Amino acid sequence: MVNYPSGVRAGGYPQKKKNQNIRYGKRGMGLEEMINQANDYYLVNHQAVIHKKPTPITVVHVDYPDRSMAKITEAYYVQPSTTDYNGVVSGKYIDFDAKETKNKTNMPLKNFHQHQITHLKNVLENGGIGFLVLGFTTLSEYYIFPASLLIKIWDKAKAGGEKSLPYKIVSKQGIKINSKMIPSLDYLPALKKLFNI
């Protein structure tokens, strides 16, 4: 597509105006990508060992258009995955999930699944640290939130209560993650503060 300097397209249609309220922080980087970058930084700097858990799948069919270009075309989940990440920080086992929403007022509980809640309960019952990294992308805010509170809210929702995790609760009961250059989502200080580790 060729555009003239005045912004008019070659086809005679004016170029669409772009939204002027652009936030440039963390541009183009999803929550998991930011966490992965932080985890690499923590590992290299001997601050923590945290890895993303692989999703267990069974591959059924693979296309080979070229020897070096295998493409999985059909696969199935072997079992429901638990949480996204686990590892060790200051000698403590940690296990957490990462969720983000564009919603400004709450994190819908439909973003979570029963098997994840059960897994986090098991982690807590066995002395591990379970938590969430929650992102409110429209607000450009990220929080560490304890799994114990999520579990209470989940149980209330199952009994007919509110079907979301309100932003007000997250911002009061969680710890806000401060942005940095490297890593862009430095969640370790917030984690250590919330759990006194």
Curated annotation (Swiss-Prot):
Q: How is the cofactor bound?
A: Binds 1 Mg(2+) ion per subunit.
Among SUPFAM superfamilies, the record links this protein to: Restriction endonuclease-like
Q: According to the UniProt record, what class of enzyme is this? A: hydrolase
Transmembrane residues, as ranges?
none
Q: Where is this region: Disordered?
A: 1-21
Keyword Transmembrane helix in record: no
Q: Name one GO cellular component term.
A: cytoplasm
Its recorded reaction(s) are:
Endonucleolytic cleavage at a junction such as a reciprocal single-stranded crossover between two homologous DNA duplexes (Holliday junction)
Q: Which Pfam families match?
A: RecU (PF03838)
Biological process according to GO: chromosome segregation; DNA recombination; DNA repair
Q: Where, per UniProt, does this protein localize? A: Cytoplasm
- Give the UniProt keywords, A-Z: Cytoplasm, DNA damage, DNA recombination, DNA repair, Endonuclease, Hydrolase, Magnesium, Metal-binding, Nuclease
This entry's Gene Ontology molecular function terms read: endonuclease activity; magnesium ion binding; nucleic acid binding
Among InterPro entries, the record links this protein to: Resolv_RecU, Restrct_endonuc-II-like, tRNA_endonuc-like_dom_sf
Disulphide bridges, residue numbers: none
The source's superkingdom equals Bacteria
Chain positions of site Transition state stabilizer: K99
Asked if the Swiss-Prot or TrEMBL record annotates the protein with the keyword Ion transport, the reply is no
Q: What does this protein do?
A: Endonuclease that resolves Holliday junction intermediates in genetic recombination. Cleaves mobile four-strand junctions by introducing symmetrical nicks in paired strands. Promotes annealing of linear ssDNA with homologous dsDNA. Required for DNA repair, homologous recombination and chromosome segregation.
HAMAP family, per database record: RecU
What family classification does the UniProt entry report for this protein?
Belongs to the RecU family.
- Protein name (Swiss-Prot/TrEMBL): Holliday junction resolvase RecU
| Source species of the chain | Oenococcus oeni (strain ATCC BAA-331 / PSU-1)
